[in-house]
Amino acid sequence: MPKPHSEAGTAFIQTQQLHAAMADTFLEHMCRLDIDSAPITARNTGIICTIGPASRSVEMLKEMIKSGMNVARLNFSHGTHEYHAETIKNVREATESFASDPILYRPVAVALDTKGPEIRTGLIKGSGTAEVELKKGATLKITLDNAYMEKCDENILWLDYKNICKVVEVGSKIYVDDGLISLQVKEKGADFLVTEVENGGSLGSKKGVNLPGAAVDLPAVSEKDIQDLKFGVEQDVDMVFASFIRKAADVHEVRKVLGEKGKNIKIISKIENHEGVRRFDEILEASDGIMVARGDLGIEIPAEKVFLAQKMMIGRCNRAGKPVICATQMLESMIKKPRPTRAEGSDVANAVLDGADCIMLSGETAKGDYPLEAVRMQHLIAREAEAAIYHLQLFEELRRLAPITSDPTEAAAVGAVEASFKCCSGAIIVLTKSGRSAHQVARYRPRAPIIAVTRNPQTARQAHLYRGIFPVLCKDAVLNAWAEDVDLRVNLAMDVGKARGFFKKGDVVIVLTGWRPGSGFTNTMRVVPVP
């Protein structure tokens, strides 16, 4: 028998924590994790960055893309349409600056985060950056009088929810700025409340307000949201992060506003309160994905229960094969410091181990002093965490839970992932039009990156929502002979994989293709050595 080619099967991508990956039990897997095992070169988890004053210049955006940003999030709680239009233009300009080289080009998605039915305070002394100190025990009057909309200070605070006096009682608590400041209601009038500061701190302009336990009667989609969503459709955004989704009907309402023209926009529902957690299954059913928005969630439900909600939501999303994003305070201290706390490093890693498809940065990239360092840090932590996943058990369970199906794409996807484990493949190459074939493969959480080749730019951008998909945009004209066109795209994926260090000549890759043109015909799996 001829000796096997000495390089074959040593795909270095698979040596990462391989000893641990082959363990028989989860405990043994943990015992075998090795801090000196080099991680994989590809990162499978998507990184979403909020774009703000610290990061909206084209130059900075280029650096962020190089550092690993996959999705640019625009927070519509702040800023005008002109402001956001300029940011979108800058993101696209930064992305396209890499377009001359199809090997290195990375499509970046644009996400619109709605303001939603949230309550915010007014401006402090007319300035977006001013702050005032609220002292514990002090009296603070809350007013609905618009004369104070831009004149808030340490004595009087305007907020934008007109029915607040109807839904809070004397003794109710009001939380401001992600719960950092707490107020207790002492008396209520027709259009004002008198509160005592329980927990003080410095208060900035336009901060979020939470009323835990109050039956807040705000519409799921406000007038502002409708205008913002229509603006998003015009601007051709790729996804919407819908704030404060409480039930499936809220998601349908967002979809209705997006209309026919925005029917391909993915709707990611943000779960931010008790009702959203309680009705999670119906919301998941109606949505394209879920965001675990831990900021507001951690005020609306007790802080010590947030991790339970996070694990439950990520688990159910993984089971259903829908993307899930873990967000809020992931590297919060990096707003002001170049290194994260140990707890934050652990938090990012554990979100990845829980099964999150994407991890998100908010203030860290929007207004922080170290936006690039934050992106790089998430990239490095995610890579290490991905290597430490106990894939043996995960794949077994995902396969057991998946319903029996006669759909050729689903069956081929399971086969491709199983084969990728067996032969330690350097990557799984998928040719996909709508993206569905790649999503099916991602659902089974392979160790190897999924290189998804598509000619549809939106499919490429939206693919970042799914764990493990590395989208490649093919800009070549379609060849007449179907087989030649397949080879053209597979070869592009091979070139990208080699250039990115995912695999080298002689390694094995899995190739998943269709047997004829069009969507819905993916059914052929091949095991191919890299040329």
Swiss-Prot record:
Q: Which residues bind ATP?
A: 75-78, 120, 207
Cofactors named for this entry? Mg(2+); K(+)
Native source species:
Mus musculus
Similarity section: Belongs to the pyruvate kinase family.
What protein name applies here? Pyruvate kinase PKM
What molecular function terms (GO) are annotated for this protein? Answer: ATP binding; histone H3T11 kinase activity; magnesium ion binding; mRNA binding; potassium ion binding; protein homodimerization activity; protein tyrosine kinase activity; pyruvate kinase activity
Which positions hold the covalent cross-link Glycyl lysine isopeptide (Lys-Gly) (interchain with G-Cter in SUMO2)? Answer: 115, 266, 270
NCBIfam families the record matches:
PRK05826.1, PRK06354.1, pyruv_kin
- Which pathway, metabolic or otherwise, does it act in? Carbohydrate degradation; glycolysis; pyruvate from D-glyceraldehyde 3-phosphate: step 5/5
Q: Where does K(+) bind?
A: 75, 77, 113-114
> Any idea which positions bind L-serine?
70, 106, 464
Expression across tissues is:
Embryonic stem cells and embryonal carcinoma cells.
